[in-house]
Amino acid sequence: MKKLLVIDFKEKIKYEDAWNFQRKLHDLRVNNIIYDTLILLEHFPVITLGKFGNESNLLKRKEELEDIGIDFLRVDRGGDITYHGPLQLVGYLIFRVEGVKNFVLKIERSIINVLNEYGIEAKENLKYPGVWVGDRKIAAIGIAIKKKVSYHGFALNVSNDLTPFSYIIPCGLKDKKVTSILKEADFSPSMEDVKKKVCLSVVREFGFDSFKVFNFSSYKELSNFDMLLEDQ
């Protein structure tokens, strides 16, 4: 039986904390101690630059970002530069991966299914990873794979402020814009509804037989991390 573990954080999480958590789960998945795991959360404002990204795509000085409460980090995922913040759904996938292209395509289709439910006609782009509405990117994807297990994942703009994307050249694409569910559908679904739809869509696209959700109000609650292992 193919089972999915879902970890749902109810409060915003610092990027560094989520990054460290992913690495712990990655080690556990590599050693077959846990099932494939999907982490769903929102971040405090942060701009991240992928390992092959170009820092010239950052349009503000780091000191300016700090003054307006946005962190900046260079990270070990693929992709270029992007922004994460409140009311944007971030999903991290700690999955065993057989084929990279097919894996990314399943992530994209999982998100497209959700957007279709909100009446948004979205699609993948064979040239540029992510999910698009016309020429506007609504979800970014950046992953890393080590020892055939993934980490990092996707960021879906729900009803977040899009202004911080003007501080960067998103994903290094100068002629592309960003959008959100709010902007495209003219209403703001609850984050809980989006999470539920994403979870069910991932289960369908990746062919899981069952899933179990663990809710945490904050990163500090991970002192109860053993409860995840006991369920395996």
Swiss-Prot record:
Keywords: Acyltransferase, Cytoplasm, Transferase. Pathway: Protein modification; protein lipoylation via endogenous pathway; protein N(6)-(lipoyl)lysine from octanoyl-[acyl-carrier-protein]: step 1/2. It is found in: Cytoplasm. GO terms for cellular component: cytoplasm. It holds the Pfam family LplA-B_cat. The record marks 137 as: Lowers pKa of active site Cys. It catalyses: octanoyl-[ACP] + L-lysyl-[protein] = N(6)-octanoyl-L-lysyl-[protein] + holo-[ACP] + H(+). The active site is at 171 (acyl-thioester intermediate). The keyword Transferase applies. GO terms for biological process: protein modification process. Substrate binds at residues 77-84, 140-142, 153-155. It is an enzyme of class 2 (transferase). Its EC number is 2.3.1.181. GO terms for molecular function: lipoyl(octanoyl) transferase activity. Residues 32-219 form the BPL/LPL catalytic domain. Belongs to the LipB family. PANTHER family: LIPOYLTRANSFERASE 2, MITOCHONDRIAL-RELATED, OCTANOYLTRANSFERASE. In the reaction, the free carboxyl group of octanoic acid is attached via an amide linkage to the epsilon-amino group of a specific lysine residue of lipoyl domains of lipoate-dependent enzymes. Catalyzes the transfer of endogenously produced octanoic acid from octanoyl-acyl-carrier-protein onto the lipoyl domains of lipoate-dependent enzymes. Lipoyl-ACP can also act as a substrate although octanoyl-ACP is likely to be the physiological substrate. This is Octanoyltransferase. It comes from Dictyoglomus turgidum (strain DSM 6724 / Z-1310). The lineage of its organism: Bacteria, Pseudomonadati, Dictyoglomota, Dictyoglomia, Dictyoglomales.
